[in-house]
Amino acid sequence: MLFRSGVHYAVEVMVKDNCVMLGGEVKGSVDMSDIETYVKNALREIGYDEHYSDIWKNYAIDVRHIEVINKIGVQSADINQGVEHDGWGDQGVFVGYACKGPALINRELWLARKLNDALYEHAKTSSNLGLDIKTQITIDDATGDIVTAIVAIPMLEPEDIKPFVVDALGTQPKSIIVNGTGIYQFHSSIADCGITGRKLACDFYSTACP
């Protein structure tokens, strides 16, 4: 779809347990006959492959048992006439604007993403750490110091990752909290249903502007 002129597509994805549901509208010639293979390959690409399933078993989504529900239809002619000529569409509203700081986003979000990326790459080579990682950074506005670094990362067995957190951030936070609720083993869509729009809104600016 990315390389086909004139194609419009608005597709949402919802994942729960081992079920992936695709819903939305498409205008143009798009071959969706092998959509199940595409979905499974996308899961493998982000790390949820057969090897991962062998390690985590029932704790995470299993690419070998994926059910794909395809509810992608044809774009409404009423909507298309506005999109085609005037650019109208129902795309929702996201908050956020460029600000002074790394990557033109607020420093807390930048550091949280940096830490998340580092942990994700580390987890991909680990037989104990999972890929469903959440991070949050709190900064003292007066000093710029990191007050708290919070990490939620699946672990089959307890593991001290605080030294890795410090190394990834390049500084020692006053407090590091890892899996503060206790055990974190069930993860991915097995534990938390994911919907495209909700996840994107959180990823852009965490619904708040600096």
Predicted regions and their residues:
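Catalytic palm subdomain of template-directed nucleic-acid polymerases
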Residues: G23-V26
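Glycine-rich, mobile lid/loop segments that gate access to catalytic sites or pores
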Residues: Y9, D17-V20, V30, T37, ...
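Cofactor-binding beta-sheet edge motifs in enzyme active sites
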Residues: V13
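Short, surface-exposed beta-strand-loop junctions and turns on beta-sheet-rich folds
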Residues: G28-S29, A208
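Conserved mixed alpha/beta catalytic, RNA-binding, or beta-rich assembly cores of soluble enzyme
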Residues: V93, V166, Y184-S189, C193-P210
